[in-house]
């Protein structure tokens, strides 16, 4: 009996490991039914346990909006303030699986003031579900979330036209919304894959089970589409990208370079190039925490041992021997600003790029994007939740790809010099291939260095708040 249980468990584990993972997010206007949709997916795929259902029934009586029925939106509206207001504030993540696939869902806020939260959720997703209220049609928030999804590199959009039960399942309404969105989508990226599904998240129609109330719709259910869609990886399987995250030297006999293989393949005996030093070497070993490998694939966490003794630092890149990738010191980026302190030309920040922290200087704000109309607006600053395009200088040449070519090596986060708080997320549009000395603000550099000295060695002085006010003045 025990042997059979072990065999069955091993088979189950093997099956789980072979399943592909799809990460998607839900977004749209407030009260379009994002949280209800996720709750319905989890409920109808039997992912909610009995004890969770018990507490869900109890919470539905206190906070729910469905009378005596279970309010499935409460499955993901976890914060007390969310349940009281009936809205989503933070990004809520949920995990579930079916017999065909594993899923990670990000339920993102619909309010404009939570644009930064939505951008955070979209940054790691492969697909976006845009909820549209069939009674209201497309809204400004629908346009904004469509644009942010594509800005963050998402190529697959499902336009879920929800609450069809409230418009008597009329095909004409569905077709009009579909037509309007297709016209709008011409302003977005050219290589989008868009599918339209009429549904009712509240009643569970066309979510997991096909409804008979919309015979004019001949397509598949939402779950069926999610289970079968094949996401084309925008990362080239040929272009090797291995940024060094850690120098692994447990003893004098071993020196390895640890990190995640972001793209391409690596094998023992392969000749590689190390950037930015532009030095060639050969892979002698590839090891993990428990074994040695002959080759490594995208996404694997590995430690690489080289044949030659080379001075390699955190943030250096291993690339193909024939790679044309070169260090650059200037770039144009799209940025989502995430703090109350406004972004101005001339400011300096730390950025984290492929595991490497480096100083950048904001040379110029090219424009701000009105995400509701997609118009470029001339601006000298960016405020909280603004999206714009800026030109930046790095303090020294660094390695990166364009975000459209490789999301992993083309993204960066901006970090405040004084508080170490993440203040922005950047997506590299292109390199300007210029090298030079970074313009500096000597007074501000001195103040930030002085601030670091005080909080590290003299925290009892209680000076940081005074300094911060002075710097931000």
UniProtKB/Swiss-Prot annotation:
Q: Do the record's keywords include Phosphoprotein?
A: no
Q: Name one GO biological process term.
A: hydrogen sulfide biosynthetic process
The record's section on NCBIfam families has:
CysN, PRK05124.1, small_GTP
Q: Could you give the subunit structure recorded for this chain?
A: Heterodimer composed of CysD, the smaller subunit, and CysN.
One Gene Ontology molecular-function label: GTP binding
Q: Please name every pair of cysteines joined by a disulfide bond in this record.
A: none
**Which gene is the coding source of this polypeptide chain?**
cysN
Task: Note down the stretches annotated as region G4.
Answer: 162-165
Q: What is its EC number?
A: 2.7.7.4
Relate the protein's function as given in its record. Answer: With CysD forms the ATP sulfurylase (ATPS) that catalyzes the adenylation of sulfate producing adenosine 5'-phosphosulfate (APS) and diphosphate, the first enzymatic step in sulfur assimilation pathway. APS synthesis involves the formation of a high-energy phosphoric-sulfuric acid anhydride bond driven by GTP hydrolysis by CysN coupled to ATP hydrolysis by CysD.
Q: Which residues are in the tr-type G domain? A: 19-238
Q: What is this protein called?
A: Sulfate adenylyltransferase subunit 1
Region: G5, residue numbers: 200-202
Question: Which pathway?
Answer: Sulfur metabolism; hydrogen sulfide biosynthesis; sulfite from sulfate: step 1/3
| Region feature (G2) | 86-90
Give the UniProt family note. Answer: Belongs to the TRAFAC class translation factor GTPase superfamily. Classic translation factor GTPase family. CysN/NodQ subfamily.
Q: Which InterPro entries match?
A: CysN_GTP-bd, CysN_II, CysN_NoDQ_III, G_TR_CS, GTP-eEF1A_C, P-loop_NTPase, Small_GTP-bd, SO4_adenylTrfase_lsu
Q: Where does GTP bind?
A: 28-35, 107-111, 162-165
The entry's keywords: ATP-binding, GTP-binding, Nucleotide-binding, Nucleotidyltransferase, Transferase
Q: Where is this region: G3?
A: 107-110
* Catalyzed chemical reaction(s): sulfate + ATP + H(+) = adenosine 5'-phosphosulfate + diphosphate
Q: In which organism is this protein found?
A: Buchnera aphidicola subsp. Acyrthosiphon pisum (strain Tuc7)
Short name of any one Pfam family annotated for the protein: GTP-eEF1A_C
Segments for region (G1):
28-35
- Per its UniProt record, what SUPFAM superfamilies does this chain match? EF-Tu/eEF-1alpha/eIF2-gamma C-terminal domain (SSF50465), P-loop containing nucleoside triphosphate hydrolases (SSF52540), Translation proteins (SSF50447)
Enzyme class, first EC level, given as a word: transferase
């Amino acid at each position: 009996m025990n042997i059979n249980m072990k065999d069955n468990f091993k088979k189950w584990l093997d099956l789980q490991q072979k399943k592909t993972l799809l990460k998607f997010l839900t977004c749209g206007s407030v009260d379009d039914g994002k949280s209800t949709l996720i709750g319905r997916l989890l409920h109808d795929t039997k992912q909610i346990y009995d004890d969770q259902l018990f507490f869900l029934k109890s919470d539905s009586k206190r906070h729910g909006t469905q009378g005596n029925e279970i309010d499935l939106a409460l499955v993901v509206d976890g914060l007390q303030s969310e349940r009281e207001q009936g809205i989503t504030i933070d990004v809520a993540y949920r995990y579930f699986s079916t017999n065909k696939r594993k899923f990670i869902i990000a339920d993102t806020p619909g309010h404009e003031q939570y644009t930064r939260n939505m951008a955070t959720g979209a940054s790691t997703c492969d697909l976006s579900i845009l909820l549209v209220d069939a009674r209201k049609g497309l809204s400004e928030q629908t346009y904004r979330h469509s644009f942010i999804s594509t800005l963050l590199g998402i190529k697959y959009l499902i336009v879920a036209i929800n609450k069809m039960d409230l418009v008597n399942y009329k095909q004409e309404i569905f077709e009009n919304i579909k037509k309007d969105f297709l016209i709008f989508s011409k302003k977005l990226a050219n290589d989008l894959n868009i599918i339209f599904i009429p549904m009712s998240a509240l009643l569970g129609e066309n979510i997991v089970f096909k409804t008979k109330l919309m015979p004019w719709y001949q397509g598949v259910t939402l779950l069926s589409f999610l289970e079968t869609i094949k996401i084309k990886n925008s990362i080239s399987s040929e272009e090797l990208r291995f940024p060094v995250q850690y120098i692994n030297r447990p003893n004098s006999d071993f020196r390895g370079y640890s990190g995640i293989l972001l793209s391409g393949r690596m094998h023992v005996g392969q000749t590689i190039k190390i950037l930015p030093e532009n030095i060639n070497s050969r892979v002698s070993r590839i090891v993990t925490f428990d074994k040695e490998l002959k080759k490594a694939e995208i996404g694997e966490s590995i430690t690489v041992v080289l044949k030659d003794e080379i001075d390699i630092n955190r943030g250096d890149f291993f690339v193909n021997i024939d790679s044309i990738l070169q260090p650059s010191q200037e770039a144009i980026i799209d940025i989502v600003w995430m703090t109350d302190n406004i972004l101005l030309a001339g400011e300096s920040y730390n950025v984290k790029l492929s595991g490497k922290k480096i100083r950048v200087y904001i040379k110029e704000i090219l424009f701000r994007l009105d995400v509701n109309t997609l118009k470029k607006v001339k601006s000298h600053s960016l405020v909280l939740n603004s999206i714009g395009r800026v030109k930046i200088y790095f303090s020294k040449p660094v390695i990166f790809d364009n975000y459209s070519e490789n999301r992993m090596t083309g993204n960066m986060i901006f970090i405040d010099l004084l508080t170490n708080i993440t203040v922005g997320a950047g997506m590299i549009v292109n390199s300007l291939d210029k090298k030079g000395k970074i313009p500096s603000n000597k007074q501000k550099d001195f103040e930030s260095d002085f601030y670091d000295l005080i909080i590290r060695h003299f925290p009892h002085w209680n000076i940081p708040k005074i300094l911060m006010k002075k710097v931000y003045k």
